[in-house]
From Swiss-Prot:
Subunit structure: Heterodimer of a large subunit and a small subunit.
Record-given protein name: DNA polymerase II large subunit
Family: Belongs to the archaeal DNA polymerase II family.
Organism annotation: Methanosarcina acetivorans (strain ATCC 35395 / DSM 2834 / JCM 12185 / C2A)
Annotated Pfam families: PolC_DP2_cat (PF24846), PolC_DP2_central (PF24844), PolC_DP2_N (PF03833)
Catalytic activity as recorded in UniProt: DNA(n) + a 2'-deoxyribonucleoside 5'-triphosphate = DNA(n+1) + diphosphate; Exonucleolytic cleavage in the 3'- to 5'-direction to yield nucleoside 5'-phosphates
Amino acid sequence: MGETIASEEMHEYFDGLEARLKEAIEIANRARAQGGDPKPTVEIPLAKDLADRVENLIGVQGVAAKIRELETRMSREEAALEIGKQVAEGVVGSFPTKKDAVEAAIRVSMATLTEGVVAAPIEGIDKVELGKNDDGSQYIRIFYSGPIRSAGGTAQALSVLVGDYVRRGIGIDRYKPREEEVERYVEEILLYKRVASLQYTPSEDEIRLIVRNCPVCIDGDPTEEAEVEGHRDLERIGTNRVRGGMCLVLAEGLALKAPKVKKHVNKLKMDGWDWLETLIGGAKSGGSAEDEQKSKIKPKDKYIRDLIAGRPVFSHPSRPGGFRLRYGRSRNTSFASAGINPASMVLLDDFITNGTQLKVERPGKAAAMSAVDSIEGPTVRLFSGDLVRIDNIKEAYELRPQVESIVDIGEILINYGDFLENNHPLMPSPYVFEWWQYDYEAACPEKTPEEELKNPSSALALRLAEEYNVPLHPTFTYLWHDINRNEFEALRKFVVEKGTFDGEGTLKLPLTASFEEGIKPLLEKLLVLHRVKEDKILVEEALPFVLCLGLDSSLKEKAGMPDTDDMVEAAGVLSGFKVYPRAPSRIGARMGRPEKSDLRKMSPAAQVLFPINNCGGITRNLVSASDYTSCMNGKIGEIEVELGLRECPACGKETYFWRCECGEFTNPKLSCPRCKIDVRGAETCPKCGRKPTSVANVKLDFRSVYKQAFENVGEREKMDLIKGVKRLMNGQMTPEPLEKGILRAKHDVYIFKDGTVRYDMSDIPLTHIRADELGITATKLLELGYREDIYGNPLERDDQVVCLKVQDLVISYDGGEYMLRTAKYVDDLLVKYYKVGPYYNAETIQDLVGVLLIGLAPHTSAGVLGRLIGFTKASVGYAHPFFHASKRRNCDGDEDCIMLLMDGILNFSRSYLPDKRGGKMDAPLVLTTRIDPKEVDKEAHNIDVPARYPLEFYRATQEIKNPTELESIMDLISGRLGTPEQYEHFMFTHDTSDIAAGPLNSSYKTLGSMIEKMEAQLSLANRIRAVDAPDVAERVLKSHFLPDLIGNLRSFSRQRMRCIKCGEKFRRPPLTGACPKCGGNVVLTVHEGAVRKYLEISKEIGERYGVSSYTRQRIELLDYDICSLFENHKVKQLGLSDFMSGSAR
């Protein structure tokens, strides 16, 4: 790895982190050397760069040095292909067979493409085999599995290209499919679309084109229960079930990312891929950027197609009253995160808070929300009739009970970089203060204080417009584009005939007449703020408004209406000023996932990976297991469990511990599972050839083990609950030491599958901090290595803004409390179990400031070293965008976990990881110690970091330009790579006074039942002008309640029975009525209440909101089905005589 290009201060920072990491590893190695863990040393290898991560992840020696060499002279993608070729040819690494070399080559290449972070190269590729074509030649078969999804479409597609590049180098022929195989792919991918989901589904002809021409066979493991019907039992396809990995690579990889594959094919001058031109030409883009540009940005309703009850719609697509787009970046936005005023959060009934995910209309699919109070908040109509804009959170709480309607929900701050990342045409910018300031500076020689310019009086705004021809200030620019010519003329006429204008600049309009003639709604559409007093509408500082209507201060018409249907242009012509659109672009949005700040548990939760079978009851309680008896005369605490047996080489004692009582380290005791004979020094059984295993059913005196564990850590047996597991998931059935579970139960912490204690939080970016926001002082920041604020001033005050260092994190107070409990557990473990000194010595969460953490994202296998520097009341985890990107995450609503460094290096073991597909995902198989901006996910390179956007940017947005056309004039991180500025001196365009402002938790989390949430959702929809409440009701019924009712009804008729004592499940009730295994009661798993759950609310909502007759009829039919199933309609038993007439009797 080359030397990190950074300032002296950043070098000190990195060196400090690595020195402390080295010290922690030495302590952990000293503790583990005693033999209390599966390995006597720390099991998380360190990696300074991408090359190290790839070598550690795949395990091919020599790869790191070769990658570093290749990356000095070629791009990442080219280096990935070349390293794959060299591994296959044997230049790097050594393999016994050609097949093994090809498999390693493809895994190494894919790991390079995914920065050595995700688990896809080891979990997403099951195996690589060599198949035979009908002409006798060999071809490569790559077997993909479900976890390949985590690699992303581009890496999936390029892994196929790698396969072709490798096979050419070692002389393997291309794949020549049979016609029935081609049709099998067509059927299978379309079936996968129905049973699972695809981002992009290619047409049948596109699938045939890919399969017939792809030189590598894209194969896969069966992942779905669904089976193909038409093309079954094919000779070269080993299953009739759907192969999910294959479908993902072909559809979301090759088909969707064909242009990117073509680019690399051209660069490498590879033949045989000409068919990509046909694929690209025939593929439907689903609305490309160019098409959208031509159509002047049409509304998109994709984000509201699948509504969920309880998660409100805040604005229908591009509708007036919805979020008004504002360009810019705050210190807590960008990287797919957007900002809104915290007053908007409060007035939207607390559904949105920091970290809440919104599904948005554009530029991407989703965004996590952050509080930015320097942009405009919502405009609301109070029950008094007043129309007020609320920019202050305190005022929002005070006025919330008085709000009748939300006329406009305020601005949403989205940075240019998100448009660039999504390749979305730039939407027209509103005429905002930042743009007006450029016009003011160009035209006006006066120097007026900026605060006065931000909130000018009407007199100042008009004087600047008249004297210097500066456009009318945004404060006095109304939403003229939201009304038509007839409405404009009606408003103008009403003001002339019935308005009065006093000497203080207040326009008075009669309230009753305003309602009768529809004038008050027009004022609300225009966002002309006003008060209602004594049957009058009062518009203060109204002269700019009056002038834009073409009237003078006496409310006399100055000029006739111009011949135009553009009311912004009309206002400009009539006033004589330059008037620009105030809100030309609206962004539709609905709630996605709520924010998260919670401890990570397995399901069911566990505190130690120690098996107790069913002996601990349904809670898997070790306390109960220690008192378990199999029968009346059985030995107390004797249980039968599956464990990996080990043998001491010195004294021959059999145990499951890693170190014998005599002090020697033990070895697995292997035996044949079929022949039951010991197998020593061989890979297979000498009799039957099977692979031996150390796993066996063991009768364990658990009571003795349990008591001994308490004695070992000096704790009293006073605990009520210590949660173990029924059965271990790892291949060798390796248990954790029981002592660890005792200490975790003492401190009330829980573990994940690898033995580590984790805490989950929603990801939010943060590039700048203030000590007073983080619960610390400037003095503490100085201790942590911060020296100056963003303006170069010495750091002296708590309110100074400083640039966040790339591996520093801010976590929630709740997370801090959990980490404090974890730190106390780790110290107890070090002292009482490992017999070394404590490490943290923490009594309060403030003592944790400065400790090292590991950050880890789901679906990845590389942790990132971080440092805790403070706490926030928001339920999120703040970190530098580079930190999130180094885990291959952005901030569109993703959530990741943290763990204490010492907990990770002390307790993590690969031996505990499940031996199944995906078992190595979400585990720190490697630890990145230093973040290099060049090696993080490229999305982070598109973040803009100027203090203000250039004037050319605002002008370009009016032409709906592609964002790539402006890269050269924007200060992007991509332009700073390879310089010390890549780490420091970032700026932002919009500040916020408190990154954690807003509700503490989304009301989605605080409301009780789903019906309560639904009522709150519809109540809010009724109040928001930009939302069509009946449409929301219809969509929720169709996409949530009705499918749930149908699914639950089906589940009821197909359900299994469950024993409430041991959890055993039965297809039908046992004849005895009791569980044959343990004698416990057997109950239904689906109850009548679950089936009826949403029926009454569906009927009520259907009536209240007048949903379509088709939807109402569906509800009626379901009501009939449910009643016929559950209601006992008593039928009178009739005899034959009841059908005879009286005379016949």
